[in-house]
Design a protein with these regions (language model features):
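Generic multipass alpha-helical transmembrane bundles of integral membrane proteins
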Residues: 114, 128-238
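Alpha-helical transmembrane segments
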Residues: 8-23, 74-75, 133-139, 200-208, ...
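Membrane-embedded alpha-helical segments in integral membrane proteins
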Residues: 17-31, 81-87, 142-151, 205-216, ...
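Extended, charged low-complexity segments
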Residues: 208-330
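N-terminal signal-anchor module of multipass membrane proteins
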Residues: 1-60
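Membrane helical hairpin/interfacial module
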Residues: 35-88, 95-97
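Hydrophobic cores of alpha-helical transmembrane segments in multi-pass inner/ER membrane proteins
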Residues: 43-54, 102-117, 166-183, 229-243, ...
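Membrane-interface helix-loop-helix junctions at boundaries between adjacent transmembrane segments
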Residues: 61-70, 82-161
């Protein structure tokens, strides 16, 4: 295997590790109940999903955050189907919006953003957003850890903060180690290197399909969530397919070949996350048992999930009309 191929697979593994961190740690349910085999299995699934997402990002030349939202919806739907269908689709169709598109979709988008930022911080606006986004994630994580065991212990049993942070650090450590090891090889990597040849791409799709069979056989995954997820993935794929443009620069062009971010940025991101987490964890309950900071988080996930596709559709439709008007075709 060539050095470039090793780098490409390193990037896929790195993004897979970030997706695992987002889906199992930031969306904290009961990760201490997972065995080593469970963690390895979910890490393998997340790496396959990361491989698919990076291929589609390069194949269809995604250009902006709205293309990224269509892309990460596919990732969120696959995570919901393959890693924890009992949690993701516990109350279908409500949890399809709140937990899959809302929670998994948003954290997946953030993990993609973190990966790109660590590859190269090229924009001052991006620099200004890094630490606030990290702090927001820490605040949300602290609220979830503190109050979810109180109001929904069946979702997230109580775990001492110190143990939760140790596990979070243990899962994030491979992400940081992979980034550190890839810092120099990333300087020679180009976006189109992330595309798979046709046969490996088809094998990847076949592997993802095969991984859904055990859940279908055991009944953990029912036909309703499966059909709905496949339809939504088809919508996302169509958006990416019809949005592709061989002429316009793609999002990955701004980050690859990489000029890796200084290590102090990663320390700052971790520091902002931890500080906000500790602050939120020690806040008293604001409001009542029905309306409080945890309730606001859950409503926020629901709103994100409900608006995910309509927002993408509205923005892309507006841009298409605007482009046609500029060409005097309307």
């Amino acid at each position: 295997m060539s050095r470039r191929s090793l780098t490409v697979w390193g990037v896929r593994l790195w993004f897979g590790a970030l997706l695992l961190f987002g889906s199992e740690i930031l969306i904290w349910t009961d990760p201490f109940a997972l065995s080593i085999v469970d963690w390895l299995g979910r890490g393998f699934v997340c790496t396959l999903i990361a491989t698919l997402l990076l291929d589609l990002a390069a194949r269809f030349r995604i250009r902006d955050i709205y293309d990224s939202m269509a892309l990460l919806a596919i990732g969120a739907l696959l995570i919901g189907l393959l890693t924890a269908p009992n949690f993701a689709h516990a109350d279908f169709p409500r949890t399809l919006l709140t937990r899959v598109l809302g929670a998994y979709g948003l954290t997946g988008l953030e993990m993609l953003g973190l990966m790109l930022v660590l590859c190269c911080v090229v924009d001052r606006r991006v620099r200004r957003l890094i630490l606030p986004v990290a702090a927001w994630n820490g605040f949300y994580f602290g609220v979830w850890l503190r109050w979810m065991p109180v109001f929904n212990p069946q979702i997230a049993p109580f775990v001492p903060l110190e143990q939760a942070l140790l596990l979070a650090g243990g899962v994030f450590l491979p992400c940081a180690a992979l980034w550190w090891g890839l810092r120099h090889p990333l300087r020679q990597l180009h976006p189109l290197d992330l595309r798979l040849p046709v046969v490996p791409f088809l094998l990847l799709i076949a592997a993802l399909i095969a991984l859904s069979l055990p859940s279908l056989i055991t009944g953990a995954l029912t036909t309703g969530p499966l059909v709905a997820s496949l339809l939504l993935m088809g919508v996302s794929y169509a958006v990416l397919y019809f949005r592709r443009s061989p002429r316009d620069p793609m999002l990955l062009d701004a980050f690859l070949p990489a000029a890796p971010t200084n290590g102090w940025w990663l320390l700052g991101i971790v520091g902002a996350f931890l500080a906000a987490c500790l602050f939120a964890y020690n806040l008293p309950l604001a409001g009542s048992d029905q309306i409080n900071q945890l309730w606001l988080m859950e409503v926020g996930f629901g709103a994100v999930g409900a608006l995910w596709y309509p927002l993408v559709a509205a923005v892309l439709a507006f841009r298409a009309v605007d482009e046609q008007m500029r060409r005097n075709q309307l």
